[in-house]
Amino acid sequence: METIRLTTAQALIKFLNQQYVHSDGEEFPFVEGIFNIFGHGNVLGIGHALEQDPGHLKVYQGKNEQGMAHTAIAYSKQMLRKKIYAITTSSGPGSANLVTAAATALANQIPILLLPADTYATRQPDPVLQQFEQEQSIAITTNDALQPVSRYWDRITRPEQLMSSLIRAFEVMTDPAKAGPATICISQDVEGEAFDYDVRFFEKRVHYIDRKLPSERELKGAADLIKKSKRPLLVVGGGAKYSEAREALIAFSETFNVPLTETQAGKSAVEASFKNNLGGLGITGTLAANKAAQQADLVIGIGTRFTDFATSSKTLFDFEKVKFVNINVSRMQAYKLDAFPVVADAKRTLEALVPMLEGYKSEYGDDIGQLKAEWLKERERLGKVTFDRERFEPEIKGHFTQEVMNEYADALQTEFAQTTALLTINETIDPDSVIICAAGSLPGDLQRLWHAEVPNTYHLEYGYSCMGYEVSGTLGLKLAEPNKEVYAIVGDGSFLMLHSELVTAIQYHKKINVLLFDNSGYGCINNLQMDFGGGSYFCEFRTADEKILHVDYAKVAEGYGAKSYRVSTVEELKAALEDAKKQECSTLIDIKVLPKTMTDGYDGSWWNLGVSEVSDREGIQKAYELKQEKLTRAKQY
């Protein structure tokens, strides 16, 4: 047996360079590069190995472990899970900062490789710097916190363990049904230890991502249910994007006159202008999609997890009559909602169903077009909301008085409505631009209002809805789409939570654009607490003497080296967007908007929340009673 003597870290980097993916006839490297923040736990091991020979790996220095991991997640998601970045961190706090990002990747089923350093395998210097001591077991370290948020987790305490661990990790990351974060913790002393590795371990390794075909039984069962239905409904999830099923979805929808609705993950799988596309459904859905959902007698899930936001906490559909066909590569997801499961690739399944349904037509007739036209009229109205200091009724009604709205207008020096600003952006940026969002009220506005006309240009992280993903993720978008303009659509709350990778983007001349909506508060949660009978309690950004906080975010960005703009009108926003396109550096547009001017929920948008059963507030009592009434019509599981 021929061997090569390498340190554990050198063997790791050599192996990463030899991993390839084969998908739809194309072959390419799976690992694009590696993000790092070096500390004493990884700088002398992985750091030295990369300095010595990174191979084809692109190496970037991050500014926050969670932030750079979110960059890697966004890159993989935008590349349809066909390429990844690895992440190396030091032990202790550096590793702990990966927990939130790992959970984000797991919730969204996105493959990334996490390589946190660990405590000493020999235990000779224990407790080493940044190691805590747990009395119940000396073997427990910070990295154990990553176990529940990793699809695969391992700890390397001997150099030879690396081989079986890496093979297993890549099997998991390249499996469409169970893709997610793989975490390999490497003891910091072991990173530098050498071993005589079998050279065959470093040969080119190709991971085949094949399309799983549906069985004849699955196709017949699905076709029979569709033929019996009168008002079927397509629910397009993220799996439809990863399957690149656009043409198959359009053909199926057109041939059988079936309306198409979208989850956050599925939006932009099919362009918004497609005649049968009714937009997002559920809690943050359009009026058109939710009406169609309530009338459906068969729901055909295409690569969706059917989260509470898609099903309105399992109250959106008429569960007394509706049936489900779930097409999903994941057996677990396909079995949800008592569905007839088709565990197969979305594109291939839809293509196979079309000839089996010859002669079938839904009974919608012109209803789909009428629903869409009704919604487009409402969308147009939302794009023209203007503020009035005397008689203004915001979209979120009954929360703030006119006096409070005027106070915000004065403090933020704006009369700009959020929906007007958002639709102005949609109309002004290039159609092939890619937008990203994750948390706050903006995801709801985007799912309802944003029209994506180019496939895979709408990037929402709504599996974990992690505040702070937006700016970090925009850098990931730019790495995936270097020739397109990329935009973070982010609220002030999420921006404050995490925006460190804006500096990384500036450092490496990777132009990103940050569109920062500032309403001085956690507006989404403020709506929530007040909708359910509470007061406005610690969700507005107010000073100790109750003054509204006014932050100059444009100046913050200028300090980092970005080109920045301050806007509070349609004209200023359009001018800033056009000028930002001309810039070669990263930009930030500080958009001051009024609170309560985001979209509100439409018919069918109820959300099951933990409302207090006992309260002295009448509003909370009524909210609890409504919850109990809604649950009588909800599916229990």
Swiss-Prot record:
EC numbers: 3.7.1.22
GO molecular function: 3D-(3,5/4)-trihydroxycyclohexane-1,2-dione hydrolase activity; acetolactate synthase activity; flavin adenine dinucleotide binding; magnesium ion binding; thiamine pyrophosphate binding
One Pfam family it belongs to: TPP_enzyme_M
Cofactor(s) this protein requires: Mg(2+); thiamine diphosphate
Keywords: Hydrolase, Magnesium, Metal-binding, NAD, Thiamine pyrophosphate
Pathway membership: Polyol metabolism; myo-inositol degradation into acetyl-CoA; acetyl-CoA from myo-inositol: step 3/7
Reaction(s) the record says it catalyses: 3D-3,5/4-trihydroxycyclohexane-1,2-dione + H2O = 5-deoxy-D-glucuronate + H(+)
Organism of derivation: Halalkalibacterium halodurans (strain ATCC BAA-125 / DSM 18197 / FERM 7344 / JCM 9153 / C-125)
Matches recorded under SUPFAM superfamilies: DHS-like NAD/FAD-binding domain, Thiamin diphosphate-binding fold (THDP-binding)
GO cellular component assignments: acetolactate synthase complex
Sites where the protein binds Mg(2+): D492, N519
Cofactor comment text: Binds 1 Mg(2+) ion per subunit. Binds 1 thiamine pyrophosphate per subunit.
UniProt-annotated binding residues for thiamine diphosphate: E65
Function of the protein: Involved in the cleavage of the C1-C2 bond of 3D-(3,5/4)-trihydroxycyclohexane-1,2-dione (THcHDO) to yield 5-deoxy-glucuronate (5DG).
Family that this chain belongs to: Belongs to the TPP enzyme family.
CDD domains the UniProt entry points to: TPP_IolD (cd02003), TPP_PYR_POX_like (cd07035)
Protein name (Swiss-Prot/TrEMBL): 3D-(3,5/4)-trihydroxycyclohexane-1,2-dione hydrolase
Annotated GO biological process: inositol catabolic process; isoleucine biosynthetic process; L-valine biosynthetic process
Residue ranges of the region described as Thiamine pyrophosphate binding: 441-521
